[in-house]
Amino acid sequence: MRRRRTALLLVLLCLPLTACQEQQNLYSATWFDLFDTVAIVQGYADSQDSWNAQTQAMYSDLQRYNELFDIYHHYDGVINLYDVNARAAAAPVQVSDELYAFLRWCKDTAYPAANGATNIAAGAVLRLWHDARESDSPAPPDADAIAAALTHIDIEDLVLDDAAQTVYFTYPEMALDVGAVGKGYAVEQTARAAQARGLTSALLNIGGNVRAIGTKPGGKPWTAGVE
């Protein structure tokens, strides 16, 4: 008899959780103006208003990182990588908490973890390829120009001052390009912020940088196609 009562109590305790999960609906949002790619977010929420509040916050976070990591444009009121590349060889450039934390992570964590494959200091070389690609007559960059640029991609020449929160380049030819890690980092930070705001079930796909938050209602895992 006691076992039956215990089993009944467990069933009753599970009912509210199941009911809450069943009340949540699937929503989505798509943006085309972030990181030069398609950004898709889908997830479960109690209402359209709740979902809209979450996606507006996520869009704001992603847009902020998009501006911070942009090496081609300046934005009013923002010190971003465009500004750093333009000024850091002349004098240390003070940057925001977010940008400094990202650059420190790139140098101290991402670079050694990938054995140097994610070198954000390789901007001088990547710029040559970008300019060649955007030219009216696209062609591979000059070999001598590439060789010269390769002498200015040592990440140790990226000087980060924790106390002053500044960025400085040892060589004027040096440039940063965070294309290898920028979107992934932005997606991770955006997902963490969304979780802190209470989002429990979502899938972010920002140009192939995928991050799941929790599971679907009922415990089913999120799935994402890989091309």
Where on the chain are the PLM-derived regions?
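Mature catalytic core of soluble alpha/beta enzymes
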Residues: 2-13, 17-227
